[in-house]
Amino acid sequence: MKIYPVILSGGAGTRLWPLSRAVLPKQLLPLVADKTMLQETALRVSGLPGLMAPLVVCGNDHRFMVAEQLRAAGITPLGILLEPVGRNTAPAVAAAAHYLKSVDPEAVMLVLPADHVIENREAFKDAVLRAAEMVKGGGLATFGIVPKSPETGYGYIRRGAALAARDDCYQVERFVEKPDLATAQAFLADGGYYWNSGMFMFAAERYLAELAKFAPEIAAAADKAVNTGYRDLDFCRLDEAAFTACPSDSIDYAVMEHTQDAVVVPADIGWSDVGSWSALWEVQQHDENGNAKRGDVYLDGVKNSLVRAESRIVAVVGVEDIVVVETQDAVLVAHKDQVQRVKQVVDHLKSKERTEHLHHTRVYRPWGHYEGIDAGDRFQVKRITVKPGEKLSLQMHHHRAEHWVVVSGTARVTCGDKVSLLSENESTYIPIGMNHRLENPGKLPLHIIEVQSGSYLGEDDIVRFEDIYKRS
């Protein structure tokens, strides 16, 4: 049996704002350890026996960061499937199943969200091996987390009869929506309920057969999206029209609640979905006062709090049970019991057409990154870093001119028909409407300061004539 991890790396980046943003959601952030959650998930399965290289499903906007993070972790994926739009887990996994069937008709899928914490790797390995036994018998396995507290933020799985093959795995009696506190307390006391982890294992063929039975529109749309998709560099793009037409639904609703072959594998693995700042506090290391801190932080008389500084010193004095998260352009201060209201902050930013929910001041691109330094009426200043050997697209702007000053490194600059090399402390000017390109031909990062001036300075004022990353 060959088991293929399918890592779901979607997400909108709302619950852990201001650190998580739309273009940099939590799975791409180093929240708990030095590695990002995506990297931790990929590394978690890389050493397990019988597991193949992972297949990653992500959104189009995250593709280069996903590929770069996997490369940095030493992981070579089987493939990276690009969703043109988010359609929840059932279509994403259906697309992955069709892709895997073309590689291995007998493929078994281990479906894992990219943004979960699993502290006990040995227990996780044991749960995977038990699930594999259930899949051999035709079961569709879901991993049920042994509850430690009466959580109201998770759905639950009620176990049924023990299975003949293993008495530590069970039929699924029913799935239960997120309960109120009293119901959650009753579930905990009962002992027959598990948290619904959103992790699954099943044969690709079995999942598609059950999906065709219970959600045929999803099955057909996913099939078409894969078959009419195409390769793009190291990515596989799902057909946009077919996938956009696919109904949105979760695996639980589309398949698991209806199939007669659902089994639950209890897992006591130190699991958290890190769905809020309070959940992150729970899984982080604490000091003697119960505080989880990261960055340049000063605490005095603070207890049971999470304090995180990204760009400057943060001092907190004489408070308890709070969350303080500082970034370059936004700061969150909240009581630990109220962090779910962060989504209302994000909704407010959207309604005011602000950008702090979309991206940080540092924005990553496949060639490197840029960072906003200053902005005002008709001008904008950026710090641009280009990785060795990389180049920006050949482009032009209708509404702005640009001045470039090389801080360090060597720049190859195309401006119209002229190509020149610039070194440290040298500069150039790009007029409005002029074709231009910036490249780093050296072996060290290129750092430049860019001053834009003009009537409109939005990132959408760009016409690309040539791009090695095939962006439009």
Role assignments for model-derived ranges:
Residues 1-3, 51-52, 75-77, 104-107, ...:
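Short coil/turn connectors at secondary-structure junctions
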Residues 1-7, 14-25, 30-113, 117-123, ...:
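Conserved N-terminal catalytic core of the sugar/cofactor nucleotidyltransferase
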Residues 1-2, 205-405, 410-429, 436, ...:
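Left-handed beta-helix
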Residues 10, 59-60, 84, 112-114, ...:
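Fold-independent oxyanion-binding glycine-rich loops
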Residues 86-91, 149-151, 181-183, 271-272, ...:
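A short acidic, often aromatic-flanked loop/helix-cap motif at beta-alpha or helix-coil junctions
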Residues 109, 173, 192, 199-200, ...:
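A residue-level structural signature of the nucleotidyltransferase/glycosyltransferase Rossmann-like core
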Residues 120-245, 263:
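Conserved core of the sugar-phosphate nucleotidyltransferase
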Residues 448:
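Noncatalytic nucleic-acid binding interfaces
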